[in-house]
Amino acid sequence: MNVMYAWFHIYRPIGPDPCPELALTPEQQVEVRKFVVEMRSRKPIVIIDAYHDGEGNALCPAATGFTHHISPWGDIEPCPIIQFANESIHDERPLRQVFNESEFLRDFRETAAQHTRGCIVLERADLLHDLAERHGARDTTARNAAYQELENLDLRPSQYNPGHEVREKNLVYRWAKKFWFNDYGAYTKHFDASNWVDSREAPIEQSNVPELHQIEQ
């Protein structure tokens, strides 16, 4: 079909109508990870994910400093689903300098890495709210309701699921991630397991939808 790559994301319930019942359980997230790893070893297509290193350890690309997000209006945000910013591409400083000197982005990376190897939006929206408020970060949404939406979020499990790591089978992916997609020392430097709030047992009322169909392998 001339498809060169596919990108797998796990749903993050956020926004004006977050639909938390659609959030995946820890078990479902492990199955998604297993599927991606298996397909990488069997199919002639590049499959991209954003949640694990080559050994299967969970990570957040924004917390590691691997990537941040630029909104349609030019706001420099920590992540596509974290719509707060103090800087813009329209600032006079070069983009590289903005990324390196932003106190908001640096504090975000450290705060996220200190508390979880997963998604701070799902696990600790309260910390994110306090962080943005402390820095006076702008709400970059058109609806101007991001702060309130964070307050309304329920605790949800994310990709950090200790004891259920799934290592890459494909040596090419494992090698590539070793050099180009890892935690860059962020968790070694900052993560403290005693700070982590285990959200895996959080009650999840999933929607009454037909049973999901298994993707043919």
Enumerate the predicted regions with their spans:
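Radical SAM enzyme [4Fe-4S]-AdoMet core and its adjacent flexible, acidic
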Residues: 1-59, 63, 72, 77, ...
